[in-house]
Amino acid sequence: MDNNMEIDAARSPEPHHLSPTTDPGSIPTLDGWIESLMTCKQLAEEDVRRLCDRAREVLQEESNVQPVKCPVTVCGDIHGQFHDLMELFRIGGPNPDTNYLFMGDYVDRGYYSVETVTLLVCLKIRYPQRITILRGNHESRQITQVYGFYDECLRKYGNANVWKYFTDLFDYLPLTALIENQIFCLHGGLSPSIDTLDNIRSLDRIQEVPHEGPMCDLLWSDPDDRCGWGISPRGAGYTFGQDISEAFNHNNGLTLVARAHQLVMEGYNWSQDRNVVTIFSAPNYCYRCGNQAAIMEIDEHLKYTFLQFDPCPRAGEPMVSRRTPDYFL
């Protein structure tokens, strides 16, 4: 984000704080935290530490290919756009009434990465069977030091402790999810090192995102119009063609790969003869791209519906008319 886009509206109110003896796993504590976070108030540093400790216990029990049941609503990138996350919940339904699967990239670029990721982690602990949060390529120590989350933590807390608590927690996020053994969900895309879901299950995910290899590819790769594997212009992961996604889906008994990671102007985009769908849930990305956002509702019969939404106008934040972006951010 450009420095000159930092505005008074992004500065945080006093953090919500509960007593040091409060159990971070208790329902009253979590409900208090969630209530505060829903008004875009950050938690106190010590509460974030205890929250992340509790979340690690929950996440380390989950699989690299986390099973998810229908009905569920699948969401793409959020990127710290907290008020647009509130709009997403308004459109899709509140927790725990709606089951949610988020496919990563909660932080960086938007004004409110701290509040966004804290709320999603709180909801995960409070309703562990109702919400699934996967790892994106921005849930990384290196990436967050460049694209905003690190600097936001310094600005809002005066030190890097909260950044460290969350980036340590990111190592425990599941890499992928599998809806009813049919719809495969992940942040980025496929890997030449991975032929089967069992290949993914055997990975050691508790680490910083590597610069190369299968774990990197799952978070960084993109579908492409060209067949086969290609070198990614991102500098990490690969591009993969329709032949690759068709073979992967066929070999693993899948009907669809759902992924995020790329800005699409209508919020969702089918590709590769409907073997792959891209979902992007940050409207007017970076407060200037003019795109719609979307979420994918999947009912108990595995029928899906896309709900598109625009950003909420907010005082103090720049607005743009919709336009085609000059490049993918």
Curated annotation (Swiss-Prot):
The modification Leucine methyl ester is found at L329. Mn(2+) 1 binds at D77, H79, D105. This is Serine/threonine-protein phosphatase PP2A catalytic subunit. Signal peptide: none annotated. It is an enzyme of class 3 (hydrolase). Pfam families: Metallophos. The lineage of its organism: Eukaryota, Fungi, Dikarya, Ascomycota, Pezizomycotina. Involved in hyphal morphogenesis. GO terms for cellular component: cytosol. Gene3D superfamilies: 3.60.21.10. The active site is at H138.
